[in-house]
Amino acid sequence: MKEKSLMQELIGEVFGTFILILLGDGVVANVGLAPRLAAGGYNWNTITIGWAFAVIIAVYVSGGVSGAHLNPAVTLTMALKRGFSWGKVVPFILAQVVGAFLGALAVYLCYRDGLVSAGNPNVWTTGPGSVF
């Protein structure tokens, strides 16, 4: 099997982390804003199942390319315990941060109107700001 280049691995991490945050935070936004909008009747089970599918899809997308670390803590642990190259740790973490930021930005843009109508989305972690 052909070895992947570092750039391919980093792109895999960006896409995987993007998908993880897009789908995971997306379900939190949907459930959190639903009572304030037209829908309703969702609970923590919906969030749990949504995050489970987010992880499954993100691992499926990036697993074959980068190993699907998708989290700086996983990357650091892999370097400490599993022989992952220390030279790749910082690039992987940067790729994960970029992917997470892009995923959160996409959720914000998709749910911007709902966040604004719910009121002051940047202040309370128990309110609309809890989406992020």
Task: Describe the function of each predicted region.
Residues 1-132:
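Membrane-interface helix-loop junctions and terminal tails of multi-pass membrane proteins
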